[in-house]
UniProtKB/Swiss-Prot annotation:
Keywords: Aminoacyl-tRNA synthetase, ATP-binding, Cytoplasm, Ligase, Nucleotide-binding, Protein biosynthesis. InterPro entries: aa-tRNA-synth_I_CS, aa-tRNA-synth_Ia, Leu-tRNA-lgase_arc, Leu-tRNA-synth_Ia_arc/euk, M/V/L/I-tRNA-synth_anticd-bd, Rossmann-like_a/b/a_fold, tRNAsynth_Ia_anticodon-bd, Val/Leu/Ile-tRNA-synth_edit. It comes from Methanococcoides burtonii (strain DSM 6242 / NBRC 107633 / OCM 468 / ACE-M). SUPFAM superfamilies: Anticodon-binding domain of a subclass of class I aminoacyl-tRNA synthetases (SSF47323), Nucleotidylyl transferase (SSF52374), ValRS/IleRS/LeuRS editing domain (SSF50677). This is Leucine--tRNA ligase. GO terms for cellular component: cytoplasm. ATP binds at residue 634. It is found in: Cytoplasm. NCBIfam families: leuS_arch, PRK12300.1.
């Protein structure tokens, strides 16, 4: 081994050896297979530190399973379809300043190179090379023979086959449907196309048509039932409004809306024609007619109304909406004569229409008073609004003044009333985003009711039933996300599956459309298996539907597939055999942002196309990664590219840092201070290993083990057990805690106690435990301890728990010694005393019996202080200690129930003569404390000048220092 740790030299050395030995190129054989995939990255930028989390978790699992004896396939491809790469090419062509800055400063692309990346093809070529280089540089154990990009002609043949199959099953339908739409690109947009508002959903509002002078004043609401309680409408006098002619389903009307609403209405399935601009002030102070009950309500000025929300005109229900009440209250003392309003607004009659047990007549007023809300700008107004809406929705019923709807639950009324309003011609559905959405081209998006659009029929109940069954039978990690997956299936509606612009595959049954970028990314895991054979010389025109039918579905005979494709039957049979061996996917590991889209579609398409035995077996989810507290963005920054992370810190250091930062759904934050700590840990690991190897410590004879050696072997089994259990449930942070941090603490204690005979054996186990996490350094140490040629640690056996090496007596002894030494050190630190003598008092017999009995009861699951005390007090010897017994028993119960699982497991069979154990290690205490040490049992304390023996506790001797 080199004298000093040099990450670059070590990592390049082992990456070259892995590549030369083809160790990660998986072929079907007679071993149990493990097929793991992660979402292929989208190539509109370099991979960044955020990718390290999902990708490294996947690699850890792949390496672990490989060392466990599984035949592991871990492939990778590249996602490039859709509009983002086309948009990026246009921005580069136009020398967009922000884009040029982000891609030179954050992505590290030289200016001249970037200027040359002015077509989608050049962008794909550049980033695919960079992405593979970065993944190789961090040590991912990927089978690169299977790589592809989603614009490869061969892959397009596969996607055409998939979509023809879905079309034949009536799972792709044509119709009108609201979609997220970019007016500039004239295309639907998906999550990959969006600059801001990726989480936005399309919400269906009810548009209520108030009437005035032959015109319609429409108001959009999520709570149509509150139309019964409208006292006024809100209009912003500073907004631009327009009069438009709206034709819908043969009905022609004149509407007045904000100019922003007019722009949105153009994209609905209505015919919209501009008539004239309208002065907003002319709309204030008029009386409009409530279409549901013909009540006359006044329009009032409100600066809070935004033109982009709904129609730009808002109905006001102050009895049930805190903001409406506050806004109205703010107008009570204002002079509104400029709008022709002279009446006292205090005279407006509030209308109560919902009965809810937590409130009286006017919930909004009560909530405002309850929270002490001062005005509309008070943050507590939002809190008051949420509590009113939540209680009314979950427990409210409509009152008698709502007519035939009286007694209906608020939670059930929306669809019923909206349908009735539409039938009466006084309402319509209006689609709006839950938050603003901006396309990557910079254009604000709209909800477009697209006619003649192709949709995946995700609302199909029979299709959903299959997905529910798949979710029920697969592993979801962490388990509590199973409910979220089911909920997402519940809510999923039909989704546009085609677009007119971008990169991608033409819809095979309608070549005017391109398949959108999430639709072509659902069953590509099966293509990895075929891709290896395609790379060996199969031509694009040979990828006929019959080939996929035979290989993936067994729908077509081998003879027909061979005849139609022109591929040798033996090759087809090999592809088919490989598919049967590798499929289904054993684990799909992904970030949590993909749950509502990619992962959901992954399940839908698998259950639609494949037989049940080919459905995915498990999904594991992890959280996000931020950079110094800020969200990373490839297109906006900030950004730490994966290549920069490796160059600056090293592959193993980067891997160790990101894996130790957070567990499963927790979000991680990449901090420079944190990765410097990881660097020190790796260097410490290297130096420790180098010292052990260089020391020439002989192999220990297991027949001559000392107590501390037995303890080391016992603790090692616990670390092995905990690491394996954590990796089996994809808790990589917990696994690393055990495999490195806790085990290193054990080793240091072992050395402190004079142990060294087992250091070589421990090192052998330790580097194998660590190999999935930090593979390069572990290969280097593995070689240094005598493994040469192709004897790689990547293929070594992963350590397994050996119960025969567990020694509870040794663990009790070290628990006692370690705890006692720590307590003495703490007393010295607090008192600042330099002791000449330390006296230790071990627990009296009655306390020891109480402790053992409590442990036994806890082990059986029936530890109860009352029962414990009653049982103890049957013993005359116990009764002789009087009130001390109940008091001590209560403390013991409290301590045991607070123990973590590992400590309780260690103590559950507790049996130790503490005095003998301490006496056997008397010299150790003398050396550590630098003074004389005496040991007594509290039952027979010959010297106890300050009555300290009474504080003795099992495994916690009482201490007196002189």
């Amino acid at each position: 081994m080199q004298q000093d740790y040099n990450s670059s030299n070590i990592e390049q050395k082992w990456q070259q050896k892995w590549n030369e030995s083809k160790v990660f190129e998986a072929e079907a054989d007679d071993r149990d297979k493990y097929f793991i995939t992660i979402p292929y990255p989208y190539l509109n930028g370099n991979l960044h530190a955020g990718h390290t989390r999902t990708f490294t978790i996947g690699d850890v699992v792949a390496r672990y399973k490989r060392m466990m004896g599984n035949n592991v396939l871990y492939p990778m491809g590249f996602h490039v379809t859709g509009t983002p790469i086309v948009g990026l090419a246009e921005l580069i062509q136009n020398r967009d300043p922000e884009t040029m800055k982000v891609y030179t400063e954050f992505h590290g692309i030289p200016v001249e190179t970037l200027k040359g990346m002015d077509t989608p093809e050049k962008i794909v070529d550049y980033f695919s090379v960079e992405a593979e280089r970065s993944m190789r540089s961090i040590g991912y154990s990927i089978d690169w023979r299977r790589k592809f990009t989603t614009t490869d002609p061969n892959y397009k043949k596969f996607i055409e086959w998939q979509f023809n199959l879905l079309y034949e099953k009536d799972l792709i339908v044509k119709g009108s449907h609201p979609v997220k739409w970019c007016p500039n690109d004239d295309n639907p947009v998906e999550d990959h196309d969006i600059l801001h508002g990726e989480e936005a959903t399309i919400i269906d509002y009810t548009l209520v048509k108030f009437k005035y002078d032959g015109m319609i004043i429409p108001c959009a609401t999520l709570r149509p039932e509150t139309v019964f309680g409208v006292t006024n409408l809100w209009i912003n006098p500073d907004l631009e409004h327009v009069k438009i002619k709206v034709t819908f389903e043969g009905r022609e009307e004149v509407w007045v809306v904000s100019k922003e609403a007019y722009r949105k209405l153009i994209f609905t399935d209505r015919e919209v024609e501009f008539i004239e601009d309208v002065d907003a002030s002319s709309l204030i102070g008029i009386k409009v007619t409530n279409p549901l009950n013909d009540a006359q309500v006044i329009t009032l000025p409100a600066s809070f109304v935004k033109g982009e929300n709904g129609s730009g005109i808002v109905m006001s229900v102050p009895s049930h909406a805190p903001y409406d009440y506050l806004a109205l209250r703010d107008l009570y003392d204002k002079d509104l004569r400029e709008y022709g309003i002279t009446e006292d607004l205090r005279e407006l009659k509030f209308i109560s229409l919902i009965k809810v047990k937590e409130f009286g007549e006017f919930p909004a007023i009560e909530a405002v008073e309850q929270f002490g809300v001062k005005d509309q700008d008070d943050p507590k107004a939002e809190e008051a609004t949420k509590i009113v809406y939540r209680r009314e929705f979950h427990g409210g019923v409509l009152k008698e003044n709502t007519g035939k709807y009286s007694g209906m639950a608020v939670s059930k009324i929306k669809d019923v009333l909206t349908r009735d309003l539409i039938e009466m011609g006084i309402g319509e559905v209006f689609y709006e985003f839950s938050e603003p959405v901006v396309c990557r081209c910079g254009t604000p998006c709209v909800v477009n009711m697209v006619k003649g659009q192709w949709f995946l029929n995700y609302s199909n109940p029979e299709w959903k039933d299959k997905v529910y069954r798949c979710i029920e039978n697969m592993d979801i990690i962490p388990e509590d996300l199973r409910v979220e997956f089911n909920n997402k299936v519940d809510w999923l509606k039909d989704k546009a599956c085609a677009r007119k612009k971008g990169l991608g595959t033409l819809l095979p049954f309608d070549n005017q459309w391109l398949i959108e970028s999430l639709g072509d990314s659902t069953i590509y895991m099966s293509y990895y298996i075929i891709a290896k054979f395609i790379a060996m010389g199969i031509e694009t025109e040979q990828l006929v539907p019959e080939l996929f039918d035979h290989v993936l579905l067994k729908k077509c005979s081998l003879e027909t597939a061979a005849e139609r494709s022109g591929i040798d039957a033996n090759i087809i049979e090999q592809i088919s055999s490989d598919f049967e061996y590798w499929y289904p996917v054993d684990l799909r590991s992904s970030g949590k942002d993909l749950i509502p889209n990619h992962l959901l579609f992954f399940l839908f398409h698998h259950v639609a196309i494949f037989d049940e035995d080919k459905w995915p077996r498990a999904i594991a989810i992890n959280g996000f990664v931020s950079l110094e507290g800020k969200k990373m963005s490839k297109s906006k920054g900030p950004l730490l590219t994966l290549n920069d992370a490796i160059t600056n810190y090293g592959a193993d250091i980067s891997r160790m840092y990101i894996l130790s930062s957070a567990e499963q759904m927790q979000d991680a934050d990449w901090k420079n201070s944190g990765i410097e700590t990881a660097r020190k840990q790796i260097e410490r690991f290297y130096n420790f290993s180098k010292d052990i190897i260089g020391s020439g410590i002989p192999t220990c004879n297991v027949e001559n083990l000392k107590g501390i050696d037995k303890w080391m072997l016992s603790r090692l089994q616990q670390r092995i057990l905990e690491t394996n259990e954590a990796l089996d449930t994809i808790r990589t942070r917990n696994a690393l805690q055990n495999a490195y941090f806790l085990l290193f603490n054990d080793i240091r204690w072992y050395q402190k106690r004079g142990g060294n005979a087992l250091l070589c054996e421990v090192l052998d186990v330790w580097i194998r435990l660590m190999a999935p996490f930090t593979p390069h350094i572990c290969e280097e140490i593995w070689e240094a301890i005598g493994h040469t040629d192709n004897d790689l640690i990547s293929l070594a056996d992963y350590p397994q728990y050996d119960e025969s090496l567990v020694d509870t007596q040794a663990e009790f002894t070290e628990e006692l010694i370690g705890g006692t030494l720590s307590d003495v050190d703490e007393i010295i630190r607090v008192t600042k005393l330099t002791p000449k003598k330390a006296i230790l008092y071990t627990s009296p017999e009655w306390k020891m019996e109480t402790f053992k009995k409590a442990l036994s009861m806890q082990k059986e699951g029936n530890l109860n202080p009352g029962i414990l005390i009653k049982d103890l007090m049957r013993d005359p010897e116990m009764r002789s200690h009087g009130k001390e017994v109940p008091k001590f028993a209560q403390k013991v119960v409290s301590d045991i129930t607070a123990m973590n699982e590992e400590k309780f497991d260690t103590l559950s069979n507790f049996d130790l003569d503490e005095k003998i154990a301490l006496e056997e290690n008397l010299e150790f205490f003398k050396n550590e404390l630098g003074c004389s040490v005496e040991i007594y049992s509290a039952d027979n304390a010959e010297y106890d000048p300050e009555n300290k023996a009474r504080f003795a506790y099992p495994l916690r001797p009482a201490i007196y220092l002189e």
